Amino acid sequence: MKRKEVVLTKETRQKEFVKKVMDTISPHLSLKSTDKVAIKIDLSGSREIYANTHYETVESLIFYLKDNFGVSDISVIEGSDGAYHSGKTTWDIFYKFRYKEVELNGAKLVNLDDLSHDYVMDVATLSGVKQISYTKSDADYVITVVPPKTHHIFPACLSISNIIGYVKQEDRALVMGTSNAEWKKFNFSNTDRFVQLIDNAGKNLARLLKEVKPSLALIDGLYGMEGKGPVKGSPVFHGFAVASEDVVSADALTTYIMGFEVDQVSYLSYAFQEDLGNNRWQNVIGVDPCQVKFPYRPHPFYQKQKLWKDFFQEKKNHGERDNRPNKTYKNFKRDRE
């Protein structure tokens, strides 16, 4: 895949944060003034502010797109997993975290859970192949804006995992490799099953990424989350931003900045294998990554998460590029007639 520019900036002032990273990446973007733009946010937490995309960042981005690109059609979109698991709606979470105010700035709010989930894809789970339903944005240019976080399945949770919001609420656990019922009684001490779960989740996210790939990843590292992410972790004041139209490179660079190995993140390895982006970066524009790197305290499951790397390498050594039968796996738009 042709390499796209990756930008890394260092900034600790909220008011200057978006301007600095966007000024740096703007000359390299394919965005046009006539584009219909969607900003995909992450509202994983129903109450946890540091689990979510910060409203101030999105507000600044809306103003930047209008003032510097002349974009007039902007939507802020999300299907909140935090809402689903707390018995609320995405609208409830929008209101709680001030996102209703984007309408005052001329943008629209779109609850992805309210859309028709007309697309279908098969995914790998611990109990076999299952089918999920998902939706798509009608935007010409999608910007995903997320904080850097740890995760109970992957060492790092970034822009690619944010695509889970397109999936029908009750199907999201299947993308992560198991059903909601199985997840509630999952035995994390069973290392083999946990490693298989990590592998399933990585493959599934890479497949979904093919269908709902963002146009631009913007990692808002003013604050991150360490420990028991992606919701119950502790905040980290970090002060960096990563941006790229190669979402795989953006996530890979951020994984390194957080102190983790890129090859330990299953969805990055599978996304690279599927030619969806580069999981290595060259000639980063901006500051040296070594100047920003700050090791995050990993999730308590990290020692088991690290075992997936050897599992994946062993599969490659045996020539198993993908152990899924092609005739079984498909994705298509459901016939609504």
Named regions from a protein language model:
Residues M1-E337:
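N-terminal and secondary-structure boundary signal
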